[in-house]
């Protein structure tokens, strides 16, 4: 029988890059898939540009986490991240759990 590794107390943190464009969408999806099934914190503090493709990845991931019964939180969102979400019709307070990242 294979031993199940212990689940860490803290959620893994996926740190978003400064530019989330078409080129970043595939790697972002892969990084999120690597932590699927666990609660996850997505650190959006460094985001300067957010494209529709990466927004689509994030929205899909959030829905997947909801379906899996896991928590998907955007933490420390930059003002650029938040304003672009609103501009693209996906205000952060309507589509994501959001909070500041604990030190």
Could you describe each region identified by the protein language model?
Residues 1-53, 57-103:
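STAS-like cytosolic regulatory interaction modules
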């Amino acid at each position: 029988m294979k031993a199940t590794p212990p689940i860490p107390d803290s959620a893994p943190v996926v740190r978003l890059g400064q530019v989330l464009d078409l080129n970043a969408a595939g790697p972002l999806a892969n990084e999120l898939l690597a932590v699927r099934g666990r609660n996850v914190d997505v650190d959006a503090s460094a985001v300067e540009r957010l494209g529709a493709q990466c927004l689509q990845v994030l929205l899909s991931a959030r829905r997947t986490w909801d379906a899996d019964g896991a928590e998907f939180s955007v933490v420390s969102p930059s003002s650029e991240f938040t304003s672009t979400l609103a501009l693209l019709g996906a205000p952060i307070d309507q589509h994501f759990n959001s909070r500041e990242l604990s030190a």
